Amino acid sequence: RDFTPREEKTGDVKQSIAERAREMADKGMRDNPYRNLTREESDRRAAAGEPFAIRLKVPETGKTSFEDKVYGLQERDYKDIEDLVLLRSDGHPLYNLAVVCDDIEMGITHVIRGQDHLTNTHKQILIYQALGAKVPEFAHLPLILAPNKGKLSKRKHGEIVSLTTYRDAGFLPEAFRNFLALLGWSAGEEREIYSMEELIEKFTLEGIHRSNAIVNFREGDPKHWTDDKAIWMNAEYIRTMPIADLLPYVKAELKSAKLWREEYAESEREWFEHTIDIIRARFFTLKDFSSQGRAYFSEDYDFDPAAIEKNLKKFP
């Protein structure tokens, strides 16, 4: 038990604790004055009503190690791991204890997560061992970063990280899934287009990259609002996927733009399918069918001023 009253620390006390921690770290010692408190003394003080937290007593010598399925052997000296708090004074568990207990309860055999959790893994292995539970296999994945090499997050980057943004911008689920899969993994082949079935068949932990992936976009630039590779891949899917698979997406887009006519599914079906098959080669997103392709489905459309200048005014 740690009897430091965490909820009542003043600024002076916090500063004193921080200074003590630095001094002890310089000496290779742990910042835990209650580490060697006897069980009797600990029980007595707890019974007397002193607030306390429960810590894990980490060995002073030796090291923890595990074979990560992506990054290989990972080792950390015990002296570099603090006597981590497991339970607060109010009895609530902290993150590391909670996730270990959850995984044990659910029978988790493989933990696959971002590489920013590598330091937590060493702590969690100690908790598994203390509880006498089998340690699962660990695989840590590279992170997805912004162009400035910072971690992508909803707080910092807003809509760029939202799946609904890509859906509303006219991305096909199949294409975006393919793009995401290749951000941190490779099948070791000279190809980039994979169906869901192929991704499942070819995926291995060994194919995961160790380096972080970067999504290249320019904030405030409508033309480059997301990675060019994502847009290219979406266009590739639009151009090459079976027309029967593409038509439902086009129908939904035309309905959204109030350009859909039921005749396209009945008496004009052959014309509609043939038209979509021709014009899709020029488009990058589903939105292009209702914008650039509007003239095929409506008499009400605008002419591109640049096209008028280039093509029509030549021939008055």
Kindly label every feature range from the protein language model.
Residues D2-K156, S162-L163:
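Active-site cores that bind ATP or allylic diphosphates and position pyrophosphate for catalysis
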Residues T38-E41, P242-D245, P316:
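Residues that cap or delimit alpha-helices
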Residues L131-F303:
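Catalytic adenosine-cofactor/nucleotide-binding cores of aminoacyl-tRNA synthetases and other
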Residues A307-P316:
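Short, intrinsically disordered, charge-balanced linker/junction segments flanking boundaries
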